[in-house]
Structure formats: C-alpha cells, structure tokens
C-alpha cells in the first residue's frame, strides 16, 4: 500500500538511498545542480521523505560555499512547543522555496506541504523528487501551481 492509498506490486523506499552516506550525497548534489540557477530562499518538503534530503542539501550546500536553508513540513502543526507545521529557519512571507520529496505517486504529500506553505505566505512553484512513479503527480501538482521535476521516472527502472 502506497501513502497515496493506492495498491502497488512494488514499493520504492527513497530512504534506503537518502539515509546512506553515498545516497544522501548524490541526491543532494543532483538537486543542488537542478536548483543552482533558481532565485530561492529555502528548500524542503513533507516529512518523512524530505527529511534526509533537506539535511543533506543543507550540509552539502554549506560545504560548497552556497548555503541553502532547509525546512520540513509536518502533516499537522505541533500541539506543543512552537506549534508550527513548518519546521526549520523561519520563512518570511513572500519567501520562495522549492519542495523536495523522495517519491511522487499522486503528489498528495507535496500538495499538502504546499498548502501549509500557502497558509504562511510562502511561495512554492516547483517540486523535485528522486522518483516520479508517473501515476498522476505531474498533472495533480500542476493544478495547484507546482511544476514537478524528477531525477528518475519509474520507466527508467523498467517498471
């Protein structure tokens, strides 16, 4: 069962890649190259898929002397502490961000993250995933103003 609610004969777990030293480095390096010409304030996305990607992006961008702030979007705001739904360095109203996630099927998690950002006045118009399963995410995200880019498409794996 996928997070989108759909059933599938295969499950792509991006954390198997992003929680290894080599995988985290490679994903971060590729995404940094994909966003190098973007005028943006931060990169982040829905927990849990975006968590290791955001951490790797922050670290590698710092090492490369082009630091990028990162953030994580919770499914719901915390009921204690800061009571925020968007965690990380404070994003100001009007900030422009790029969303990231490990896998996109329908795009639901990315859309929910965008809605949370919309509520605080943060602008997201692009999302990058490691794998696009090619099951509707491109069209669904376009409906909410997000352009989806991916490192891989499902067809790249012969699936």
Residue ranges of each PLM-predicted region?
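Short, glycine/charge-rich flexible loops or terminal/linker lids adjacent to PRPP-binding catalytic cores
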Residues: 55-98, 106-112
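Short glycine-rich phosphate-binding loop at a beta-alpha junction
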Residues: 39-49, 128-129
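Short acidic, glycine/proline-enriched helix-loop-strand junctions
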Residues: 37, 53-68, 139-154, 158
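Short Gly/Pro-enriched loop/turn and capping motifs at secondary-structure junctions
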Residues: 78, 103-106, 131-136
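Active-site-facing substrate-recognition patch
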Residues: 1-39
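Conserved acidic residues
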Residues: 41, 95, 125
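PRPP-dependent phosphoribosyltransferase catalytic core
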Residues: 115-159
């Amino acid at each position: 069962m996928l997070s989108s609610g759909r059933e599938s004969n295969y499950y792509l777990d991006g954390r198997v890649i992003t929680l290894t030293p080599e995988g985290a480095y490679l994903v971060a390096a590729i995404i940094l190259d994909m966003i190098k010409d973007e005028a943006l304030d931060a990169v982040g996305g829905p927990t849990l898929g975006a968590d290791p990607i955001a951490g790797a992006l922050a670290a590698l961008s710092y090492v490369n002397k082009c630091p990028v702030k990162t953030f994580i979007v919770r499914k719901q705001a915390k009921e204690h502490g800061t009571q925020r739904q968007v965690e990380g360095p404070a994003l100001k109203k009007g900030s422009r961000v790029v969303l990231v996630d490990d896998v996109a099927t329908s795009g639901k998690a990315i859309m929910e993250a965008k809605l949370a950002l919309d509520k605080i006045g943060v602008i997201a118009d692009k999302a990058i995933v490691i794998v696009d399963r090619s099951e509707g995410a491109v069209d669904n995200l376009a409906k909410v103003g997000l352009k989806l880019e991916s490192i891989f498409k499902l067809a790249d794996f012969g699936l």
